[in-house]
């Protein structure tokens, strides 16, 4: 469109959109945006106007003291490219087998220290409540919500949750792939051993509600989820999953991911309790398939209970010891799909519009639904 007019580069335009907002960018160079075929003006405006949040994004950092804080990562640049306003910045402690008491706690503290320094390098602050999220969005400043995937670091010590809270933790994934030293509940990919939520897991949920930490029940089996919902006094999130009817085109991936998907019945239970469920990018080979997976979940539990939770990485993988990680298609947020030409949230908004979502609906799924439960959870302590 209007290709004879002077234009900015795509990077210059996307930066302007993120920093100044769509309206300001157009005022600075009103024709430049539409000279870039990849960015539709309606998409750009929605991205600028909404608080786009990925509720489960892995940022790999070192967990051993000799490697803290790791190589510089361009988190700010990746976030601006993506169009996201915020991410729930998470990491896991059990990728390398935990073998002794205290090891998970040490990894957790090293991970937080690494993240402290990486955030400082990037000029990014943690959002501790909804007011922080809204202020960062108003200032066009990327922000993060500190998360952890799995309560392995607790090791039976309730007081460690308070320590984590004071270090900025506001989103706790109760479980991950392996059982913690002091278990919190049954993991959906492991044989059930504990009858659902354990007594210590119940204590942790109560303490999260008291302190003001959002509880994430991803990786929990049905019995654990049911017990947690009966106990919780604030809404919860299942940050990354997909409806078990949406299996995609890759049969191998479908078989592997099937235990990690949520049934219609369980999704309704979470929604009826006021919770939200994040749809991941797995099992979606194209942005349109991803938007269709979002639509499938919306059709089951309603527009007010669905959010985005990619289970991807904005920044490169970190391999302990300096090893090489080749990565794979779909691993990085801004490269979620083959031949993706624009940042993640721009791509998703475009696909959602093409799938029939309204601007208001995109705003809810993009971030408003998460903001509602995050606000309710962090109201435990201001």
Q: Where are the regions a protein language model picked out?
A:
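Loop-centered beta-sheet repeat module
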Residues: 194-229
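Short hydrophobic/aromatic-enriched beta-strand-loop microsegments
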Residues: 235-241
